[in-house]
């Protein structure tokens, strides 16, 4: 089989759901389990995508992810005594349809990014982002409505 077909089969076996064969994930790609990751149609990820899928990560149709993006679902206490007990929990991340995530973006646990959204390069997404906007910064904030 072709290299493209082989890569698709590996991703299909690794991930919880892949909507179609129009998926491109450049290497390297890192994840915790894979089975918690659901990817929609016509997905593209540039190199060095990291997804810590302790909880479900859902990515909609027609999404593009730049290089060096990290998506985290794992949470730890900010209290040092509790943190030292190694207690961990997870919160899901949801990314809507038609989303472009720029390079070196970090998406934190429990975040929902709406549809038709652009997240600017280098942003740290700490809270939900609504549909139809451009959002940038650390912390990531809406700077423009689109559509």
Task: Name every feature range the model reports, one short phrase each.
Residues 29-39, 44-112, 138-140, 144-147:
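Flexible, glycine/small-residue-enriched loop-and-beta-strand segment within the central core
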Residues 111-114, 129:
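Extended beta-solenoid/beta-helix repeat architectures
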Residues 100, 118, 134-136:
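Short-chain dehydrogenase/reductase
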Residues 1-22, 140-143:
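Terminal amphipathic alpha-helical/low-complexity segments used for targeting or macromolecular assembly
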């Amino acid at each position: 089989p072709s290299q493209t077909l082989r890569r698709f089969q590996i991703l299909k076996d690794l991930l919880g759901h892949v909507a179609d064969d129009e998926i491109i994930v450049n290497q390297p790609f890192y994840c915790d389990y894979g089975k918690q990751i659901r990817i929609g149609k016509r997905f593209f990820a540039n190199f060095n995508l990291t997804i810590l899928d302790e909880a479900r990560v859902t990515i909609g149709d027609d999404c593009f992810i730049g290089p060096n993006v990290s998506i985290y679902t794992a949470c730890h206490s900010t209290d040092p005594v509790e943190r030292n007990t190694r207690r961990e929990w997870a919160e899901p991340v949801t990314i809507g349809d038609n989303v472009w995530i720029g390079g070196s973006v970090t998406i934190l646990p429990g975040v929902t990014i709406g549809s038709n959204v652009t997240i600017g390069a280098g942003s740290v997404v700490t809270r939900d982002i609504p549909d139809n906007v451009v959002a940038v910064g650390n912390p990531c904030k809406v700077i423009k409505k689109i559509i």
